[in-house]
Amino acid sequence: MDSSSTKSKISHSRKTNKKSNKKHESNGKQQQQQDVDGGGGCLRSSWICKNASCRANVPKEDSFCKRCSCCVCHNFDENKDPSLWLVCEPEKSDDVEFCGLSCHIECAFREVKVGVIALGNLMKLDGCFCCYSCGKVSQILGCWKKQLVAAKEARRRDGLCYRIDLGYRLLNGTSRFSELHEIVRAAKSMLEDEVGPLDGPTARTDRGIVSRLPVAANVQELCTSAIKKAGELSANAGRDLVPAACRFHFEDIAPKQVTLRLIELPSAVEYDVKGYKLWYFKKGEMPEDDLFVDCSRTERRMVISDLEPCTEYTFRVVSYTEAGIFGHSNAMCFTKSVEILKPVDGKEKRTIDLVGNAQPSDREEKSSISSRFQIGQLGKYVQLAEAQEEGLLEAFYNVDTEKICEPPEEELPPRRPHGFDLNVVSVPDLNEEFTPPDSSGGEDNGVPLNSLAEADGGDHDDNCDDAVSNGRRKNNNDCLVISDGSGDDTGFDFLMTRKRKAISDSNDSENHECDSSSIDDTLEKCVKVIRWLEREGHIKTTFRVRFLTWFSMSSTAQEQSVVSTFVQTLEDDPGSLAGQLVDAFTDVVSTKRPNNGVMTSH
């Protein structure tokens, strides 16, 4: 009976422990569920501190936990040693002007916020700690005593050396506590004779026993005398402390301007503060004493301009009375960065055409054209160039104007996006097999000359029927080519008289340059180079098809510029050019990017 009862107790104990462990492991999940349930299904605007020994609820707008993390580096110590931290705390029982934040001593040294601090010619803090967050000045004599107590009780040499060195740095250059500093200086000299410089790698990594040092007893005696002497001075150490001057509230932060308001503290009324002086300077610099902003107690809102974007500035405020300087506070602020890429303003100025329709301005039209190559617009540019070649530019614009002046239809059918017809002679097929100009065999821009001659000399009625069925229309003996409008981005149909002349010399066709814009030259050159790379075996047909489709349909202005740069720079080295294009654009051309900018993969 005794053994069975013992087993049952052990089993019950194990079950209880498992339940307890599960309860502790699910604390985070339960906290999240409580956050959801407590808000009626809405998440609370807070997050839980990652420190296992803290687990405090931190407001969402805070970047670090103010309860356990350093206000300078925003990190926490898992095994926190309070003697290695500085805290902004009240010096008196009735002191309410403090923020309560803490920081590592080493972080305070790095930011020059502890020890003997010279704030220009304005103020000099001797043996004090200036809070990194609010600027409140506190004494460090208590922290200095903690270092000597830890040094006296240290059992390892590295710990002893570090604590003595820390106590020496805290009061280095002091005039108020020179007697205490001389005691630590003597202990430091003794240790350096044995282990070398206290801030060197030898002393910091020496894990030897302290009792085996010949000077260990003398160093411990010096620590004891220094601690006793500090206790006598601590009662009068707070007489020269500087209280906080004010609180800062940044109302607006811009790239080159900051608007802030100084919040007055209760001590300002008690001690009859007359006004405030403000210095602002870049982090790491020192302010000039005569360059400050003076403001009274009634006008505490200031706008600071002529700042540099994306720069951290320090704002230092000193309150003054009739007797002189009274309080000191400081705060840091990062100015915002400047947006290089600005969104297109939909309310940009537009020009008005002949019939009163709003047309995009020249700047907007150029930006729209350069953003991507539209196949429909490409066909329009090609026909415009052909009209210039044949001297029919005036007829082209006359027909276009007549088309615009026609009364609009009551309801236009919905336009099919990218529903262009590659059979229309005005729209070239970018993926069609490329034929060099020297082997064109009597064709001009991919259009057989004999077919045009037959169209001019054939039967009028039959040819008109065939032309209309193929998306073209003929009038009299001249073939008037009209696009069906499905591929034109601007949605207009145009007529153009085409009169082809047989060209005996095939090299002349290559000399006809398109003067419409540099965009067409870039596209034409890139297409020729890509086809040339395919014929030479440097790229595959699949990559060529996808690349040209992407380049003409979806590429942005920046991507087009990159491709053009690659082509112009590496044109003499086809292997390097092909490798660069494949490496840079394989993922891009394999991704479908609709016109609305949403990325959808295959």
Swiss-Prot record:
**What GO terms fall under cellular component here?**
chromatin silencing complex; nuclear speck; nucleus
Single GO molecular function: zinc ion binding
Q: Which UniProt keywords apply?
A: Flowering, Metal-binding, Nucleus, Repressor, Transcription, Transcription regulation, Zinc, Zinc-finger
Q: Which residues form a coiled coil?
A: none
Q: Where does this one sit in the cell?
A: Nucleus; Nucleus speckle
For bias type Basic residues, the affected ranges are 9-22
Tissue specificity is: Accumulates in shoot and root apices, and in leaves.
Start-end of PHD-type zinc fingers: 67-137
**Taxonomic superkingdom:** Eukaryota
| Alphabetized InterPro entries for the sequence | FN3_dom (IPR003961), FN3_sf (IPR036116), Ig-like_fold (IPR013783), Oberon-like_PHD (IPR032881), VIN3-like (IPR044514), VIN3-like_C (IPR056990)
- The record places domain Fibronectin type-III at 242-340
Q: What is its main location?
A: nucleus
- Gene induction: Expressed at higher levels in short days (SD=8 hours light/16 hours dark) than in long days (LD=16 hours light/8 hours dark). Slightly induced by long cold exposure (e.g. 40 days at 4 degrees Celsius).
Question: Which effects follow disruption of this gene?
Answer: Impaired vernalization response with incomplete repression of FLC during and after cold exposure, due to a reduction in vernalization-induced histone H3 deacetylation and methylation (e.g. H3K4me3 and H3K27me3). Delayed flowering in short days (SD=8 hours light/16 hours dark) conditions but not in long days (LD=16 hours light/8 hours dark); enhanced FLM levels dur to an enhance level of chromatin acetylation.
Say if the entry is tagged with keyword Cell wall biogenesis/degradation. Answer: no
| SUPFAM superfamilies, alphabetized | Fibronectin type III
Q: Where is this motif: Nuclear localization signal?
A: 144-151
Q: Where is this region: Disordered?
A: 1-38, 430-470
Q: Which GO terms describe its biological process?
A: flower development; negative regulation of gene expression, epigenetic; response to cold; short-day photoperiodism; short-day photoperiodism, flowering; vernalization response
Pfam families, sorted: fn3 (PF00041), PHD_Oberon (PF07227), VIN3_C (PF23380)
Q: Where is this region: VIN3-Interacting Domain (VID)?
A: 502-602
Share what the entry says about its subunit structure, partners included.
Interacts with VIN3 and VIL2. The heterodimer made of VIN3 and VIL1 is required for establishing the vernalization-induced epigenetic silencing of FLC. Component of the plant homeodomain / polycomb repressive complex 2 (PHD-PRC2) large complex during prolonged cold, composed of core PRC2 components (VRN2, EZA1, FIE and MSI1), and three related PHD finger proteins (VIL1, VIL2 and VIN3) that mediates histone H3 trimethylation on 'Lys-27' (H3K27me3).
What is known about what this protein does?
A: Involved in both the vernalization and photoperiod pathways by regulating expression of the related floral repressors FLOWERING LOCUS C (FLC) and FLOWERING LOCUS M (FLM). Together with VIN3, required during vernalization for the modifications of FLC and FLM chromatin that are associated with an epigenetically silenced state (e.g. chromatin modifications, histone deacetylation, and trimethylated H3 'Lys-4' H3K4me3 and 'Lys-27' H3K27me3) and with acquisition of competence to flower. Promotes flowering in short days (SD=8 hours light/16 hours dark).
Indicate what this protein is called per its UniProt record: VIN3-like protein 1
Q: Which gene encodes it?
A: VIL1
